[in-house]
């Protein structure tokens, strides 16, 4: 099981109040990893990233997706060393690529990220 699959499993187990759908899409490059539906009936997407260092790597297709769709899109990054989980808005993708994990996240920690995502559309 790869690191992003492990992060997905952790996310699904710790945040069961959100319906998570894993998108394994090879035909539409750049499509985020997850489609989610919260308790307010709000859909959003989440791109999963796992990194060993400060830098977060994106494909040009992932960048293009988030630039074109800046609303209701998120990037969840787990830093393996400290085990930190940070949530960024999709609209921050260019800054996140440039600054890495030094960029201020909109949420820290898996539980806090879950609360924030579940409150969308409320």
Predicted regions and their residues:
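Short strand-connecting beta-turns/loops that link adjacent beta-strands
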Residues: 39-41, 80-81
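Acidic-basic catalytic patches of nuclease active cores, encompassing PD-(D/E)XK
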Residues: 1-25, 39
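Mg2+/Mn2+-dependent nuclease catalytic core
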Residues: 51-70
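Nucleic-acid nuclease catalytic cores
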Residues: 67-92
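Conserved catalytic cores of phosphodiester-cleaving nucleases, focusing on short active-site segments
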Residues: 34-36, 42-52
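Beta-rich catalytic cores
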Residues: 30
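Charged phosphate-binding loop/patch that engages nucleotide di/tri-phosphates or the phosphate backbone
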Residues: 97-122
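Helix N-cap / beta->alpha transition motif
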Residues: 59, 87-95, 109
